From Swiss-Prot:
It comes from the Eukaryota. Keywords: Antiport, Chloroplast, Hydrogen ion transport, Ion transport, Membrane, Plastid, Plastid inner membrane, Potassium, Potassium transport, Transmembrane, Transmembrane helix, Transport. Disulfide bonds: none annotated. It holds the Pfam family CemA. It is found in: Plastid, Chloroplast inner membrane. It comes from Ginkgo biloba. GO terms for cellular component: chloroplast inner membrane. GO terms for molecular function: antiporter activity; proton transmembrane transporter activity. This is Potassium/proton antiporter CemA. Belongs to the CemA family. Its main location: plastid. It is a multi-pass membrane protein. Contributes to K(+)/H(+) antiport activity by supporting proton efflux to control proton extrusion and homeostasis in chloroplasts in a light-dependent manner to modulate photosynthesis. Prevents excessive induction of non-photochemical quenching (NPQ) under continuous-light conditions. Indirectly promotes efficient inorganic carbon uptake into chloroplasts. GO terms for biological process: potassium ion transport.
Amino acid sequence: MGPIPRSITRTLSRFRTELTSESSPLVIHELKVAKYKVSASLQYLAFLVFLPWGISISFQEGLGPWVTNWWNTGQSKIFFSYLQEENALERFGEIEELFLLERMVEDSSETHSQDLRIEIHRKTIQLVKMYNKDCIQIISHLLTNMICFAISSAYFIMSKKKLTVLNSWIQELFYSLSDTMKAFSIISVTDLCIGFHSTHGWELMIDSISENYGFVHNEQIISGLVPTFPVISDTIFKYWIFRHFNRISPPLVVIYHSMNE
């Protein structure tokens, strides 16, 4: 068996048969079903990829002015202050260092001391504005993510038929491969997404999610999750492969372990 899935060659064979006027009504029906599976699956995948992205952009622009006005009224500053408390303390620590520097040089020049006070005051206002902007962005991201999750979940529930078609199409593509190509595909996906070679990708993803939800970058938490989560996921996935494919195709399990080693 070559690297081209049998489902694709079958579809091309049906199409060629139809062009040569050798087709029967059953073959035409099968060809239409195959075309529907491909188009419905690709449309569903496109919606899953671009729907959250489009919702995020549209609601970020729409919620921005409302969140800014709501935050500036001072109704929830205390409630959300803990989200960026560590970051704010670190920034204002710089101001404290500048005050200490001022005390050291205030005897040398009164003019210089006055300029330093002005600079410290300006820097303080700048940091307060930056902190205020960060808090507004955190709230906007939280609201946008909740709305995006709700809409995506509703679409996912309402489109169970397309999900069934997508699942059928993927299974047809996968099971039409040879055992060697199946094992190669599984190893490629696992190493790329959840394997031991994807630790840097997990680090970037965890850092991006934490910043998106307003949590301060914590190197200890990231360094603890990155080496642990891929190992657990890889172990669970290998166990599932052994339980599932050992009943369907035992040679695939043997080839998978041989290639993985």
